[in-house]
Amino acid sequence: MASITLTPSEKDIQAFLEHYQTSLAPSKNPYIRYFLKLPQATVSIYTSGKILLQGEGAEKYASFFGYQAVEQTSGQNLPLIGTDEVGNGSYFGGLAVVAAFVTPDQHDFLRKLGVGDSKTLTDQKIRQITPILKEKIQHQALLLSPSKYNEVIGDRYNAVSVKVALHNQAIYLLLQKGVQPEKIVIDAFTSAKNYDKYLAQEANRFSNPISLEEKAEGKYLSVAVSSVIARDLFLENLENLGRELGYQLPSGAGTASDKVASQILQAYGMQGLSFCAKLHFKNTEKAKKRLER
């Protein structure tokens, strides 16, 4: 199902509503000003000014605002910002988010370097090529440490909204550097509807439309670059945290994490665990139970 997010002017929004007023429908979402049920598409107009179009006819109605669809096969042939995050599924370590700006003339260089989805590259290869990428590619990297992560989760953010905030901030800061992308792609970690809902609470905003696409790291080199740099940043953070505590911290959230967590808990208490791990994971309770044996 096609999903398009736009930020048109209020004048264009009102013109759209007038044109399709017979399709207005009620919505229980407090963040939605207007909701329209159209043939082959739904349109949600949010209080933030964003518009979300979903359905097979999304592109048709988006054209009302001047939107022009880009064929998937030619998507690479545009100057793009792509974002990705690493660390979301790991108990230990922070959450790394990177936005990278890649132009078509950089594609050959990136392919020769071996850039692809970081999930298909060895950690050794990632550590090897990341310094080159950081030097050659305009990017913005953000790292939310475990201690800061634990501070904001359950207070202002949840596991999804904190990623929305980081992706948005990385893109915002990269745009501030003067790059001019024709498209912005986020490796989808939630629905466009959820993304826009959580985006409403963020202060830093930009007018460029974004596209959330599943497995985008395999479609766009800009997302692949972000994936690689983010993986390197996460691994570096994992090593540094482990070095400070005197433990080798495993990536992931399996039984190895439970074992190390129980050792850290015994040695340093919850304060030590909060320093290096995301406490809302189930591993925390499993580590406590290990100490009770």
From Swiss-Prot:
Which InterPro entries did the record assign?
Answer: RNase_HII/HIII, RNase_HII/HIII_dom, RNase_HIII, RNase_HIII_N, RNaseH-like_sf, RNaseH_sf, TBP_dom_sf
Required co-factor?
Answer: Mn(2+); Mg(2+)
SUPFAM superfamilies (UniProt xref): Ribonuclease H-like (SSF53098)
Q: Where is the RNase H type-2 domain?
A: 78-293
Q: One Pfam family of this protein, by short name?
A: DUF3378
Q: What PROSITE patterns does the record point to?
A: RNASE_H_2 (PS51975)
Q: How is the cofactor bound?
A: Manganese or magnesium. Binds 1 divalent metal ion per monomer in the absence of substrate. May bind a second metal ion after substrate binding.
Give the enzyme's EC designation: 3.1.26.4
Q: Which reaction does it catalyse?
A: Endonucleolytic cleavage to 5'-phosphomonoester
- Coiled-coil stretches noted in the UniProt entry, renumbered to this chain: none
**Residue sites binding a divalent metal cation per the record:** D84, E85, D187
Keywords from UniProt, A to Z, are: Cytoplasm, Endonuclease, Hydrolase, Magnesium, Metal-binding, Nuclease
- Annotated family: Belongs to the RNase HII family. RnhC subfamily.
Identify this protein by name.
Ribonuclease HIII
Q: Which organism is it from?
A: Streptococcus pneumoniae serotype 4 (strain ATCC BAA-334 / TIGR4)
